């Protein structure tokens, strides 16, 4: 079915950005204020256990959808899309995403109410959700987690405190607003 034909079948058309990010037990280092010439002190942990957070954000409204997985592959991505599609079944979703190999495998089943727009290769800066990952990791800076369960709890608390206003202020680039206005979305 053509995209134009799909549009008439749904209540509204929504624009989302998607990406995945790895969160783990390795210490997230960020700048600290110190006296000039003094190296900042912090406890470093070099454990390499991690989890993947898959995320979708609607920059205009600040609405978001996150799901945690233990790994990054097309099977997890397909289930993630299905869960998202079931949450908003009456809307047509245009999703901007990067060119990760698992985003376009032959066997990938994309729900009918989702259309992909692939961003140019090697341009994470055009995907607004990258700024949200940075924002989340800034909350985790210099934390040392004993295990993944403690990291999960902290991450869930941070995500639960995110308001739509904050998400929109981080991810709503002016060029996106302009493009959506021109496209009448």
Residue ranges and their predicted role:
Residues 11-15, 130-185:
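C-terminal anion-handling pockets and recognition modules
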Residues 12-13, 90-92:
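A general structural motif
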Residues 19, 91-103, 127:
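Acidic/histidine-rich, metal-coordinating catalytic segments
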Residues 23, 122-126, 150:
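A short acidic, often aromatic-flanked loop/helix-cap motif at beta-alpha or helix-coil junctions
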Residues 24-26, 103-105, 126-128:
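Short catalytic/ligand-binding loop motif for oxyanion handling, primarily in non-cytosolic enzymes
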Residues 39-46, 112-131:
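RNase H-like polynucleotidyl transferase catalytic core
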Residues 105-113:
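Short, aromatic/basic amphipathic alpha-helical patches
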């Amino acid at each position: 079915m053509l995209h134009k034909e799909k549009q008439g079948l749904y209540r509204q058309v929504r624009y989302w950005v998607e990406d995945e990010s790895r969160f783990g037990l390795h210490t997230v280092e960020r700048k600290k204020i110190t006296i000039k010439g003094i190296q900042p002190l912090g406890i470093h942990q070099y454990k390499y256990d991690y989890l993947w957070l898959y995320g979708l954000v609607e920059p205009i409204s600040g609405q978001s959808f996150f799901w945690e997985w233990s790994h990054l592959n097309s099977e997890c991505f397909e289930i993630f899309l299905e869960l998202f599609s079931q949450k908003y079944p009456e809307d047509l979703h245009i999703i901007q995403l990067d060119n990760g190999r698992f985003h376009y495998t032959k066997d990938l089943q994309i729900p009918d109410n989702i259309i992909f727009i692939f961003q140019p290769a090697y341009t994470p800066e055009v995907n607004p959700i990258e700024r949200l990952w940075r924002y989340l990791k800034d909350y985790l800076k210099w934390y040392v987690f004993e295990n993944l369960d403690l990291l999960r709890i902290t991450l869930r608390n941070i995500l639960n405190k995110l308001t739509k206003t904050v998400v929109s202020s981080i991810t709503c680039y002016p060029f996106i607003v302009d493009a959506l206005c021109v496209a009448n979305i």
